[in-house]
Amino acid sequence: MNFPIAAESSLPQRKAEHLQLCLEAGVESPEVTTGLERYRFQHCALPNLSLQALDLGTQFLGRSLGAPLLISSMTGGTETAQRINCRLAIAAQKYRLAMGVGSQRVMLRQPETTPTFDVRDLAPDILLLANLGAVQLNYGVTPAEAQQLVDRLGADALILHLNPLQECIQAEGDTDFRGLLGRIGELCAALSVPVIVKEVGNGLSAMVAAQLLSAGVAALDVAGAGGTSWSRVEGQRAVDPLLRRLGDRFGDWGIPTAESLQQVRQVSATVPLIASGGIRHGLDAAKAIALGADLVGLARPFLVAADQSEEVLDQWITELLAELRIVRFCTDSGDWAALRRPGVLRPC
């Protein structure tokens, strides 16, 4: 798939291309995996539990959730994105899941796109996360504008995404990251809501996690390697043959999700931590929780289901929750903390 983009492709057009590629093209990391397949749960043949009585609920950033699941930030800015976001928001409200929207920078440049992000009326009770590329703080976006995005969405927190590799491959990429940590710290101090920092599929290292926490970031999302590769997404968008080759070459770049999760958890035992990146079902989500995650983010599975229909999305979430419930039951884990007991999750 090839898009005839120019160096200054419009943001809505770029978002439409991203969405189409993630739905239709082969943009997964070709060889690297999440690393979660290297772990197996110890089966308990005599659980002292009732399957139906298990409570999947949890707390994150002071909010109650029906399950430790995040509909990860994906899209906005187009009519198709609006349809998908609305379906996701309705599902998030029904199942009490957290939800993030796609990058809102387009709202600053083209306010007419704002309705494509507006989901609060459909989901008044959910943990809703605004979203902005962190590097945009180096390109003129001010703390006041970030606060404006939060307020317009009615968000409970702001996600800043770090995507240096994607920016390298993107024809329109913003690649001046100098001094960005300081600007993130300034934003954390100025904003009225907590700041979450995430990668976009290449993982956070222990060193970067420590730097971000020292800057005042409230929570982290490792977004490790093993799922959608934004290097491949941008490579497939590109017309320039060099960018297309670079996109493929770096398709497996990054820290696998399981490794990134453990690195970050070693930095802080208490930081609210989200695991995402290549998690495609409840069994892997449960493994991520056992390895130290408080919340698990999934993007592409929600996107594919929501693009089909509300019914398909509903069926998929029901299956996801059933998988989490069965893991808890068959490991004799009465709560999520029990899933982290020594010996419950073992290396294969």
From Swiss-Prot:
Cofactor: FMN; NADPH; Mg(2+)
Disulfide bridge partners, by residue number: none
Keywords annotated in UniProt: Cytoplasm, Flavoprotein, FMN, Isomerase, Isoprene biosynthesis, Magnesium, Metal-binding, NADP
An MF annotation (GO) of this entry: NADPH binding
Positions bound to substrate: R14, K15, S103, Q104, R105, Q166
Catalytic activity field: isopentenyl diphosphate = dimethylallyl diphosphate
GO terms under cellular component: cytoplasm
Entry-linked SUPFAM superfamilies: FMN-linked oxidoreductases
Gene3D superfamilies reported in the protein's UniProt record: Aldolase class I (3.20.20.70)
Positions bound to FMN: S72, S73, M74, T75, S103, N131, K198, T228, G278, I279, R280, A299, R300
Gene Ontology biological process terms in this record: isoprenoid biosynthetic process
Residues that, per the record, bind Mg(2+): E167
Primary role: Involved in the biosynthesis of isoprenoids. Catalyzes the 1,3-allylic rearrangement of the homoallylic substrate isopentenyl (IPP) to its allylic isomer, dimethylallyl diphosphate (DMAPP).
Quaternary structure and partners: Homooctamer. Dimer of tetramers.
Protein name: Isopentenyl-diphosphate delta-isomerase
